[in-house]
Amino acid sequence: MVSFGGIARKLFGSSNDRRVRSFQPNVAAINSIEEKTKALTDEQLAAKTVEFRALLAEGKTLDDILIPAFAVVREASRRVLGLRPFDVQLVGGMILHSNAIAEMKTGEGKTLVATLPVYLNALSGKGVHVVTVNDYLAQRDAATMGRVYSFLGMTTGVIVHGLSDEERHAAYACDITYATNNELGFDYLRDNMKYEKNQMVQRGHNFAIVDEVDSILVDEARTPLIISGPLDDRSELYNTIDAFIPLLVPSDYEIDEKQRSANFSEEGTEKLENLLRQAGLLKGNALYDIENVAIVHHVNNALKAHKLFQRDKDYIVRNDEVVIIDEFTGRMMPGRRYSEGQHQALEAKERVQIQPENQTLASITFQNYFRMYAKLAGMTGTAQTEAEEFANIYNLDVIEVPTNLPIKRIDEDDEVYRTFDEKFKAIIEEILDAHKRGQPVLVGTTSIEKSELLAERLRKQGFDDFQVLNARYHEQEAYIVAQAGVPGAITIATNMAGRGTDIQLGGNLDMRIERELGEVEAGPEREARIQAIVEEIKELKQKALAAGGLYVIATERHESRRIDNQLRGRSGRQGDPGRSKFYLSLQDDLMRIFGSDRMDSMLTKLGLKEGEAIVHPWINKALERAQKKVEARNFDIRKNLLKYDDVLNDQRKVIFEQRLELMESTNISETVSDMRREVIEDLVDKHIPERAYAEQWDAAGLKTGALNILNLDLPIEDWVKEEGIGEDDIRERLTQATNAAFTEKAERFGDDIMHYVERSIVMQTLDHLWREHIVNLDHLRSVIGFRGYAQRDPLQEYKSEAFELFTSLLNNLREAVTAQLMRVELVQQAPAEPEPPLMQAHHLDPTTGEDDFAPAIYQASEVIVSPENRNPDDPATWGKVGRNETCPCGSGKKYKHCHGAFEQV
């Protein structure tokens, strides 16, 4: 029975079809001026850039010049690269320009499509960022497409790991900048830790086109970019707690693989309390008493390390280090670390050296970073399954771009076996059968462990003519993937390793020329050898086509349909034939978690024998329903996390805007004066209650407060005894005394020095308090969920308490700045250079990208406070204290073992 919706779509087309058709008039207009554009000389074509910019300066919009601009880029691409964008690629370019996501199948030329809107939007002079998932793709695309932009008189920069600030500043100043998502986010955070505006490298967020947008804005949305600094060594504590976990039995804990959570049962809690008590680690009577919050955190991490994290699936151990494995690509991510002590728990489990924990100094999620852009667009081969998320969170529509040629790939029904062994046996038979007929095969696995298991079984069959592509050997990744289309080639790859590199039937011409003729100089010999490679690839392509094209064999379903579609999409590029099939077993993770027991019972009743498979569209639909459930749950998690992160993001915007204003100001005396006035108001209000009699005033407390904060010893107790004195009189006298003392100091310092001191103290104090605030919000976030048990909305509770914490931060800022400025003195000798804190930039458990760990060292200029001006009872007056100095509190201990220890908590 045909639905009314189906009839309507047949009559009028889908909404996607209508959106695509809406771009056709512009496509026709671009085609109509193609011959005229072709007739231009190179100089005339390049001069169009100047002409377009002049039109914009006169008031024209980018939409007004889209047609001639796209025509110019198309012609420049033809002349420079030998590639002429097809009509459907023009449509893709218009989709990107219109703030949307263009879903384009593998091999349809997304990289070339991007040049059209990139050039158009770069004409504004505000900069365009093209975002890729790794340094290799950023460099490759910048080098290739940069030739087109250069031909048209535009500059291209590329941001990769390891560049200096000067190099980054120059790259961001270009018309077009290629960069990874991680580098962009880290540069934003680092810019907002600088103390001079001219040290900042970014120049704003105008327009970004995100390649592999689903990977960056969906897969990585839950994992923030973090800049952190190391805390004190706690390796002994991790090792002690780790030793407890093997003593537990399954009834002592509960594991939820769906939610990736692990909790102790009542019996397990009692056993753990006894162990902790014997080790002298338990305070009070119970594990969950408030004073044991830190210990609870440690034991939970240890339990997860042993029961949820699997070696060679979630991480590998290499060179005495625990290295995270990307869940989606199977790549190693050296330098990346789990947060909140989880990585240290894994190191304790594996008996490798435990690295120090880190304290978060600055962080941001990709969700909030990319929403800062005035204009955002994206490209990918697989976005429709996440269309709702893109619309709700990023306000981005997903529009599917028609392929230039029809897709000929055959997607077969899944084959389901009862066990791993049966499944792998069938896969190996299928691989060898395809190899015999010369068909190239790409085998997709979900983990390193599975890829190596499959490779080992092939070797046992006496066959070793294959390539294994996983996290252990990713250096040759792009080349191996590019040659996976050679007839008879067998490539085993973890999930989507090598994403961004096309698999071309017969092999990749450009890569072969680069590898085989890289050292051969230009000339007749090189041209002859290039021609020989061209002919060889043509012949190999015909053989691969005759064998049926690329055959994608998947060893497991991923919990996301999108990842499965990405693997399928490797085959059948640009109208080539191809084939895909998924081989499953009831022992697979997805099947096991979602009802494999019932299916096993059903298959037994059907009389399924060992080695036999069931193939039926019903199985595919059942699995798709399970995947939709997982996708919906993950979307809800990301939506919920974003609601909480938005609270921090709103506060982050305020702080970063304040920092920028401070950096741009040469004189903040008025701001500092307002802070002093508000501090005095708070002091008086605190010690002189409203409508209270003079004898009820806390004169002693006010005197102490004035001494501790304002560094003024005033006869306040005498003032309050005066006949007829009021609250306003006390406030006025405090203000006059404070301003007089500050004015005298400012005159001694001189305007230039005083302005520098004020600015430095405000910025350093703001940074210190903001870092403490981030930690406080993290702690609040970790426990706020329990408010739900009291029938209160955790999110509303979080918003309310986060606001109170932020208000407290601002009050503390005013008080600390005032206290330091009232005590600061110039020292005669040049102060010793302070030791800079080591800061690491890392992205926790991300889902794509590699080798983008970016450590950095920063040193803030310090204002030295003379020891005689430090109040032992008020840390706000101590200024910068060296870790090995005697603590100003008078304890006699070193600062790092006394009050300095609190900074590390």
Curated annotation (Swiss-Prot):
May bind 1 zinc ion per subunit. GO terms for molecular function: ATP binding; metal ion binding; protein-exporting ATPase activity. It is found in: Cell inner membrane; Cytoplasm. GO terms for biological process: intracellular protein transmembrane transport; protein import; protein targeting; protein transport by the Sec complex. ATP binds at Q89, G107, E108, G109, K110, T111, D502. Zn(2+) binds at C887, C889, C898, H899. GO terms for cellular component: cell envelope Sec protein transport complex; cytosol; plasma membrane. It is a peripheral membrane protein. InterPro entries: Helicase_ATP-bd, P-loop_NTPase, SEC_C_motif, SecA, SecA_CS, SecA_DEAD, SecA_motor_DEAD, SecA_preprotein_X-link_dom. Its EC number is 7.4.2.8. Pfam families: P-loop_SecA (PF21090), SEC-C (PF02810), SecA_DEAD (PF07517), SecA_PP_bind (PF01043), SecA_SW (PF07516). It catalyses: ATP + H2O + cellular proteinSide 1 = ADP + phosphate + cellular proteinSide 2. Keywords: ATP-binding, Cell inner membrane, Cell membrane, Cytoplasm, Membrane, Metal-binding, Nucleotide-binding, Protein transport, Translocase, Translocation, Transport, Zinc. Its cofactor is Zn(2+). Its main location: membrane. Monomer and homodimer. Part of the essential Sec protein translocation apparatus which comprises SecA, SecYEG and auxiliary proteins SecDF-YajC and YidC. Belongs to the SecA family. Part of the Sec protein translocase complex. Interacts with the SecYEG preprotein conducting channel. Has a central role in coupling the hydrolysis of ATP to the transfer of proteins into and across the cell membrane, serving both as a receptor for the preprotein-SecB complex and as an ATP-driven molecular motor driving the stepwise translocation of polypeptide chains across the membrane. HAMAP family: SecA (MF_01382). This is Protein translocase subunit SecA. It comes from Rhizobium leguminosarum bv. trifolii (strain WSM2304). The lineage of its organism: Bacteria, Pseudomonadati, Pseudomonadota, Alphaproteobacteria, Hyphomicrobiales. The gene is secA.
